Each structure stands twice: as structure tokens, then as C-alpha cells.
């Protein structure tokens, strides 16, 4: 509550609606070691002070680090300042690497059991998922649009849509409901997975449609350009949907996608998700830019070595003091004289 008061003081807003308004939905996200306090003791305190009670108290398990429990006393921890210097500074990757950390922490969130942060896992999440699946799909869609559709959103020729087209459109339209329900159920890992899976569906769709092959058939196949248009129209609408759906998890990336699509951030409103009309036909889009960079093995080795070195440098100093001299023993008869 004090943090809310300070925030309100800094921003000139009222803190009371957040803790006293009966229409407010209050959720307490906690660790499993605080369940008793947040479910029994704290609600009593809130009620006595006239505050609203939490609607739900999702409790997470513990997250370990490289095979051991995190510990500030042993320096077995991750320093945000180090991460900013090593990954987020413009020369090292910029804000997109902030999203990478958010993504990995969500992917391994200990929602139902203890989990573990490893630098190798962090690298794999970035390179194998954000770069190879999410970023790769969006980059391919924009590259092919500029190459095969003059840099503009092509029209959709409904009469030529086949089963795969309809299935992909349906996946886009159902994505909002899937992700939304998982978020409402506090299943953030699964919600984020659905977002990446939609990008995976886009990659598979593009691979099966092969618009680059159709481009070689323009003279022999009168429908080739229309089929290319259909493929890239669907891929671009899927890209716009990825911006909306990824916004809760990858906010910097979502805004970067909006920049590439030349749309205002207003498109990120959640109600727009699932639409196949986010981008207007004939609208010019910007040239593609890579959303994520690969993280090299050398960078990961450096982080692991830094972690181990910091822990070694803070080994606890054991203070040894000589044991007091043992006093002479007494016989039982002397002990029996004591009035207890």
C-alpha cells in the first residue's frame, strides 16, 4: 500500500481506488513461502482498515540459478545493472534484449513447480525461439512483400483461398480468445507459448505456400501473383496480430513491429487482436529490420564465469574462537544437594 501511495504522490493520482474501490480487482502475486500471510493474516489487516480483499492469490514456486538456490549473501544472483551493461545498452542489443529477458523469465516461470534460470537456456530461448521463429517469420513476410508486392499490402482474393489459407486465418482469429483465457487463468507461460506458436504457424504456412517459387511461375501461371498476394496478405495480417498478442510479454518488440508496419501504437489495443483487417490493402510498409540478434556462445560463457567468480569472491569468512576451558566435573552427591 505504501508503494501505491508513493506512486500516486509522484504522479499526482489518487491511490485509494486501487485499495478501497469495490470495483477494483486486486490480485496478489506471491511466492509459495508467503501463502499463509497473504491468505489469512494480510486479508484480516486489509478488512480492518477498510481495504478491499484480493480476488485471487496466485503463488509461484521458487526459481533457482544455475543448479543452486539464489543467495545474496553468497553472491549467487543476477545483477540487473550487469544485464543492462552487457545486453541492453544500444551497442550490445538495445531494448530488444530487455524483451529477451522478460520472455525467458516468463517461459521458465515457476508457476507449478520449481524452475531454474540457466544462461544456456536464456541463449536458447533467444536464438531458437525469438530469432528463429518469431523474428524470422516477421522478417520473411516483410522481405517478400517488398520483393513480390512492391512494398505494399496486397489484396486478398477470396475465390482462391484453399484449406490451408482458411486454417491459418482461423488460427489468427482464435488467437485472442486462447491467449486471453490463459492470461485470465494466470497461466502466463502457456499464454506466451500460444503467441510464439502463432508465429510458428505462420512460418509453416509460408513454407508450404512457397511464394518465392510462385514468383518464378508468373509467366506460365496466370493465378501465380494472386496466390502470392493471398499468402503475403495473410502473413502480414498475422504479423500485425503478433504485435498485439506479444505486447504483454514483449512490449518493446511490439512497438518495433508497429514502426515497421507504419501503424500507430493504438493498434495494440487488445480488442483489435484476432482481426484480419488490421492492415489496409495498398498500404506501404517500411523495409524490414531484424527484431532480435543472436546471442553468441562467448557472451554466455562470460556470464557464467562472471557468476562463478562473484560467488568465489564473496565466500563467507568463518570466524573461529577458542572454546572455553572445561570446568572440573562434580560427583552426583554434590549435584543432589542443589535445591531445584
Regions found by a protein language model. Name each.
Residues 61-160, 263-291, 295-299:
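Catalytic adenosine-cofactor/nucleotide-binding cores of aminoacyl-tRNA synthetases and other
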Amino acid at each position: 500500500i505504501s508503494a501505491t501511495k508513493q506512486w500516486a504522490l509522484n504522479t499526482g493520482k489518487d491511490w485509494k481506488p486501487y485499495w478501497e474501490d469495490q470495483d477494483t480487482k486486486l490480485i496478489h502475486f506471491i511466492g509459495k513461502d508467503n501463502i499463509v500471510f497473504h491468505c489469512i493474516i494480510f486479508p484480516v489487516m486489509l478488512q480492518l482498515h477498510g481495504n478491499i480483499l484480493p480476488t485471487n492469490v496466485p503463488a509461484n514456486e521458487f526459481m533457482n540459478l544455475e543448479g543452486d538456490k539464489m543467495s545474496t549473501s553468497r553472491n549467487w544472483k543476477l545483477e540487473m545493472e550487469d544485464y543492462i551493461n552487457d545486453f541492453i545498452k544500444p551497442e550490445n542489443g538495445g531494448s530488444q534484449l530487455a524483451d529477451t529477458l522478460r520472455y525467458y523469465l516468463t517461459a521458465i516461470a515457476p508457476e507449478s513447480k520449481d524452475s531454474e534460470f540457466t544462461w544456456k537456456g536464456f541463449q536458447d530461448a533467444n536464438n531458437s525461439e525469438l530469432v528463429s521463429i518469431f523474428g524470422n517469420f516477421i522478417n520473411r513476410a516483410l522481405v517478400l512483400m517488398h520483393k513480390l508486392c512492391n512494398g505494399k499490402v496486397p489484396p486478398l482474393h477470396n475465390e482462391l483461398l484453399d484449406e490451408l489459407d482458411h486454417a491459418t486465418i482461423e488460427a489468427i482469429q482464435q488467437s485472442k480468445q486462447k491467449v486471453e483465457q490463459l492470461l485470465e487463468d494466470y497461466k502466463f507461460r502457456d499464454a506466451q507459448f500460444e503467441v510464439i506458436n502463432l508465429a510458428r504457424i505462420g512460418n509453416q504456412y509460408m513454407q508450404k505456400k512457397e511464394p518465392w517459387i510462385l514468383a518464378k511461375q508468373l509467366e506460365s501461371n496466370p493465378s501465380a501473383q494472386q496466390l502470392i498476394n493471398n499468402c503475403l496478405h495473410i502473413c502480414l495480417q498475422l504479423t500485425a496480430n503478433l504485435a498485439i498478442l506479444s505486447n504483454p510479454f514483449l512490449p518493446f518488440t511490439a512497438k518495433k513491429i508497429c514502426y515497421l508496419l507504419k501503424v500507430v501504437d493504438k493498434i495494440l489495443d487488445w480488442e483489435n487482436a484476432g482481426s484480419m483487417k488490421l492492415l489496409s490493402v495498398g498500404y506501404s510498409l517500411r523495409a524490414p529490420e531484424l527484431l532480435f540478434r543472436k546471442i553468441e556462445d562467448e557472451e554466455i560463457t562470460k556470464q557464467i564465469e562472471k557468476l562463478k567468480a562473484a560467488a568465489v569472491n564473496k565466500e563467507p569468512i568463518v570466524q573461529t574462537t577458542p572454546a572455553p576451558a572445561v570446568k572440573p566435573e562434580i560427583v552426583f552427591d554434590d549435584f543432589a544437594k542443589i535445591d531445584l
